[in-house]
Curated annotation (Swiss-Prot):
Cellular component terms (Gene Ontology): collagen-containing extracellular matrix; extracellular matrix; extracellular region; extracellular space; Golgi lumen; lysosomal lumen
This protein's name: Fibromodulin
Gene label: FMOD
InterPro entries xref list: Leu-rich_rpt (IPR001611), Leu-rich_rpt_typical-subtyp (IPR003591), LRR_dom_sf (IPR032675), LRRNT (IPR000372), SLRP (IPR050333)
Compartments in which it is found: Secreted, Extracellular space, Extracellular matrix
Residues that bear Pyrrolidone carboxylic acid: 19
Length: 376
């Protein structure tokens, strides 16, 4: 029964190929005819309908009937709001504050974003050691005015928002309980090897839009890290080792020119890698660099590649637009081409290269039979 199905599949393929043998581009016409939605060829991620980095801050647990009586609102600083229906939340955002006010001990969620705060003085949170979230993004905080131990007593802190400030170095020490750390849109130039030491519970680290030139081995101890964003920096090298739990790595818009052989094997759960707008060449990539069975999406667009690097057959989305690729090698996708061995690739972007449609091998439709979008 199995051989009958295989022979039937092969026969259908031969029949389809013979039917369109007068049109060398029949496969492209077929793929376009199957697209049911509008496609923008300049959109690097045409199927991505969500914001890559959703930015929302919860408002904390609400007071419900039957709970203990709400606390006395008189302990709330006059510069802020402490609504009775959110008894553990203090809202001090968008008030032109230049300093951090007193924080009552009952607070777990404090919001100081979008003010003119320049410093985080030592001891400012010592009265509220049960804090879970601190939002300080969108201020004018500088590194020399952040108390060195200002966060050390917050043993329950889970989320810290310090993005969109004027920080030039990593804050610390930070509590081990931290799960999300937002330091993007600052002026940080390096990440010392011990800057993130002990943060074994950290799942998301946002360092995009800084001036980072080196991260060294600072990421190795982050055994729970799932998302790492280092995009829009000045990195010339990838980090020395990746956390084993990592699923999303964003390093677009840097100066990376090489990726070591088998680099991603240390992150067996990695799903998404974005290395667009770097300085990658084929000489800087080994043959097994991207042959990771877990990868679903790989973005190498706008680099200096001349050949398609070999990828694993499990890859679903490959973005190579804006390079210097001048040949189409089917072996980059399928080491063996037949009716039972094929790539799972669905989206392939090759537009903006030096390759022509006529370079497409005759056996490409058999290898890339699951593709729904191919742009050349």
């Amino acid at each position: 029964m199995q051989w009958t199905s295989l022979l039937l599949l092969a026969g259908l393929f031969s029949l389809s190929q013979a039917q369109y043998e007068d049109d060398p581009h029949w496969w492209f016409h077929y793929l376009r005819s199957q697209q049911s939605t509008y496609y923008d060829p300049y959109d690097p991620y045409p199927y991505e309908t969500y914001e890559p980095y959703p930015y929302g801050v919860d408002e904390g647990p609400a007071y419900t009937y039957g709970s203990p009586s709400p606390p006395d609102p008189r302990d709330c600083p006059q510069e802020c709001d402490c609504p009775p229906n959110f008894p553990t939340a203090m809202y001090c955002d968008n008030r032109n504050l230049k300093y951090l006010p007193f924080v009552p001990s009952r607070m777990k969620y404090v919001y100081f974003q979008n003010n003119q705060i320049t410093s985080i003085q030592e001891g400012v949170f010592d009265n509220a050691t049960g804090l879970l979230w601190i939002a300080l993004h969108g201020n004018q905080i500088t590194s020399d005015k952040v108390g060195r131990k200002v966060f050390s007593k917050l043993r329950h802190l889970e989320r810290l928002y310090l993005d969109h400030n004027n920080l030039t170095r990593m804050p610390g020490p930070l509590p081990r309980s931290l799960r999300e750390l937002h330091l993007d849109h600052n002026q940080i130039s390096r990440v010392p090897n011990n800057a993130l030491e002990g943060l074994e519970n950290l799942t998301a680290l946002y360092l995009q839009h800084n001036e980072i030139q080196e991260v060294g081995s600072s990421m190795r101890g982050l055994r729970s890290l799932i998302l790492l964003d280092l995009s829009y920096n000045h990195l010339r090298k990838v980090p020395d080792g990746l956390p084993s739990a990592l699923e999303q790595l964003y390093m677009e818009h840097n100066n990376v020119y090489t990726v070591p052989d088998s680099y991603f094997r240390g992150a067996p759960k990695l799903l998404y890698v974005r290395l667009s707008h770097n300085s990658l060449t084929n000489n800087g990539l080994a043959s097994n660099t991207f042959n990771s069975s877990s990868l679903l999406e790989l973005d190498l667009s706008y680099n200096q590649l001349q050949k398609i690097p070999p990828v694993n057959t499990n890859l679903e989305n490959l973005y190579l637009q804006g390079n210097r690729i001048n040949e189409f090698s089917i072996s980059s996708f399928c080491t063996v081409v037949d009716v039972v061995n094929f790539s799972k690739l669905q989206v392939l972007r090759l537009d903006g290269n030096e390759i022509k449609r006529s370079a497409m091998p005759a056996d490409a439709p058999l290898c890339l039979r699951l593709a729904s979008l191919i742009e050349i």
